[in-house]
């Protein structure tokens, strides 16, 4: 007998399916001993070439996603990787025994059908079954046909079900594959060589980010997961591989939101004997090529906004962009103190360690970045934020660097690469000073990389592309998780830590409250009638993404799954109490039927519930978080 699920409350549907499997085994038809299929054509090939296949014998195989019919005639929809086709089966053709087994097939079963191609009286291209075989038994039912799988958290966790139930999801990942293939073809045709470099590194340099830490037992050495591809690729330029690129995963121990995932796909390339101007030309041509090849057009639409990759991309310096959108001319600011003063005047937050160049970058992020909708190269960054880049000869306070923007997002980052080992050592020293001041994203000195530069690196241009953001734009996907097959998710049993695995973060000590020092607001004297109260719609929601709202010190923007299949946006002024990344994956309570309220130009649709009290004169706030087993959309009574 097949071992059935032991948990209490197992559905009758699952029980019946296990019983069907037992019956198949007893009849000598165990589907799980079958190792192959005679499939010789895909369903879409038949449908796209009907005249060629009409009345011809074919063998198709795939998943059964619908069945209908009565008595001695059955119709079924069979799906394979290319699409679906209707199966027509008759008792008279298959015989009593085979037709009897076919009638016991369930939605989700994987089957093989041999027969001939024809059109029904309704004009639907179909396969008239002559032989049928069950290849694999589905023991758990798929989500109900018309509602499908809409719970966003569950879609990400069970992507295999998501791909079955939501064809548009599969289309997204087919396009992603084509995008990456198109990038490779373009670069290969331009004479670039694809390489692979280490993921486990002793020194995680090449970017400003917090790395993941691990320990290599065999060498008894602490290592890090790479945060960039840069430094090893530059070593290859030194070695004479003049045009190299890598497409690979990098890892940054940072927050999760609609555009960030801790592991993501990066493409970096380096080309000897060119500079950042050459990288601009390459970027423009590459984006145009990929869009045309994958989408058939150089005009793309994202979230209703049209962007034209066919026109020459705009080029603007960071200084000019800040002046244009903030009114502040940093050419007229000559000291760090002046920069801090104007930042205070404009309400731009900064840290005391920040210098003029850092503050210029903060101004760009605050005032200009959101306006970079059409393809735009923002050039000539301050040296303070560009430790691996060549200085501009005419103004050494700035470097030959650009960031490529679309839709207000940074899509790529490129340099005229620094190849002066003496200058590079000084930059590393400056980074180590920042590290000593508490900047855990600063780099340490990489002596082997300096040794490579001392051997001699030719003038080089380099660029890094975020593949995931590129896929978001070209597939019109709302969140980075929608273009990652298996995005990073908080484990459902994350509280059950395996023994012997060290935590990378200090255990949280539960805060003890002296309730004698707590003050709460008095209860209301006025009553609300039950009818009025019952009109408030309290729902459980899952936090898909959370990020700080630009230009606001208090607001967090939540992207929520409320069970409807459409993301809900709510803004809440709780940044003083929570960091965005710690709320992703939580289950919260909201009132959903409040009218939208515009906050910082964003419609907030509902209100998060929280508990507030005062303790020794300081306000404390706790969001109402509930058990993650409660599904999105569950109503509170």
Residue ranges and their predicted role:
Residues 1-521, 525-526, 531-542, 564-566, ...:
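Class II aminoacyl-tRNA synthetase catalytic cores and aaRS-like
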Residues 78, 555-560:
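Short Gly/aromatic-enriched secondary-structure transition segments
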Residues 547-548:
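An active-site-proximal beta-strand-loop segment
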Residues 569-570:
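Conserved RecA-like helicase motor-core motifs
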């Amino acid at each position: 007998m097949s071992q059935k699920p032991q948990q209490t409350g197992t559905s009758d549907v699952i029980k019946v399916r296990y019983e069907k499997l037992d019956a198949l085994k007893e009849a000598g038809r165990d589907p799980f001993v079958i190792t192959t299929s005679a499939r010789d054509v895909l369903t879409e090939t038949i449908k796209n070439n009907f005249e060629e296949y009409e009345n011809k014998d074919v063998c198709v195989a795939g998943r059964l996603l619908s069945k209908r019919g009565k008595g001695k005639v059955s119709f079924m929809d069979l799906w394979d990787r290319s699409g679906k086709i209707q199966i027509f089966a008759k008792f008279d053709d298959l015989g009593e025994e085979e037709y009897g087994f076919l009638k016991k097939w369930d939605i989700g079963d994987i089957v093989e059908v041999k027969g001939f191609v024809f059109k029904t009286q309704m004009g639907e291209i179909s396969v008239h079954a002559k032989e049928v075989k069950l290849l694999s038994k589905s023991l758990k039912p798929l989500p109900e046909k018309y509602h499908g799988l809409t719970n966003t958290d569950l879609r990400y966790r069970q992507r295999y079900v998501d791909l079955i139930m939501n064809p548009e999801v599969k289309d997204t990942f087919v396009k992603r594959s084509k995008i990456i293939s198109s990038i490779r073809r373009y670069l290969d045709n331009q004479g670039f060589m694809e390489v692979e470099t280490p993921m486990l590194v002793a020194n995680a340099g090449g970017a400003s980010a917090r790395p993941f830490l691990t320990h290599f037992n065999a060498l008894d050495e602490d290592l890090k997961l790479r945060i960039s591809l840069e430094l090893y690729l530059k070593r290859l330029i030194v070695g004479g591989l003049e045009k190299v690129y890598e497409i690979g995963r990098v890892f940054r121990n940072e927050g999760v939101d609609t555009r960030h995932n801790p592991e993501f796909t990066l493409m970096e390339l380096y080309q000897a004997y060119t500079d950042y101007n050459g990288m601009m030309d390459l970027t423009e041509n590459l984006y145009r090529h990929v869009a045309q090849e994958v989408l058939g057009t150089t005009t793309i639409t994202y979230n209703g906004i049209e962007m034209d990759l066919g026109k020459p991309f705009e080029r603007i310096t960071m200084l000019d962009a800040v002046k244009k959108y903030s009114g502040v001319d940093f050419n007229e600011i000559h000291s760090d103190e002046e920069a801090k003063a104007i930042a205070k005047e404009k309400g731009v937050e900064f840290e005391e360690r920040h210098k003029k160049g850092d503050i210029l970058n903060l101004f760009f992020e605050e005032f200009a970045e959101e306006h970079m909708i059409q393809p735009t190269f923002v050039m000539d960054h301050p040296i303070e934020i560009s430790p691996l880049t060549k200085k501009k000869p005419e103004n050494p306070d700035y470097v030959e660097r650009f960031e490529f923007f679309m839709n207000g997002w940074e899509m790529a980052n490129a340099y005229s690469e620094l190849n002066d080992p003496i200058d590079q050592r000084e930059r590393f020293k400056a980074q180590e000073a920042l590290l000593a001041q508490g900047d855990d994203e600063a780099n340490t000195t990489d002596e082997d990389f300096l040794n490579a530069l001392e051997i001699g690196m030719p003038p080089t241009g380099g660029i890094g592309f975020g593949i995931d953001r590129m896929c978001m734009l070209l597939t019109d996907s709302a969140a980075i998780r929608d273009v990652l097959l298996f995005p990073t998710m908080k484990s459902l049993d994350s509280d059950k830590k395996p023994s012997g695995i060290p935590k990378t973060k200090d255990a949280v000590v539960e805060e003890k409250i002296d309730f004698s020092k707590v003050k709460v607001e008095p209860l209301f004297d006025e009553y609300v009638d039950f009818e009025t109260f019952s009109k408030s719609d309290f729902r459980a929601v899952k936090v898909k993404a959370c990020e700080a709202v630009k230009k606001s010190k208090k607001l967090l923007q939540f992207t929520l799954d409320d069970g409807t299949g459409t993301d809900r946006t709510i803004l809440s002024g709780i940044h003083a109490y929570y960091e965005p990344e710690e709320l992703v994956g939580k289950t919260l309570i909201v009132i959903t039927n409040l009218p939208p309220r515009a906050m910082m130009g964003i419609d907030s649709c509902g209100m998060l519930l929280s508990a507030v009290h005062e303790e020794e004169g300081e306000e404390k706030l706790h969001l109402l978080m509930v058990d993650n087993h409660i599904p999105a959309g569950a109503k509170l009574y």
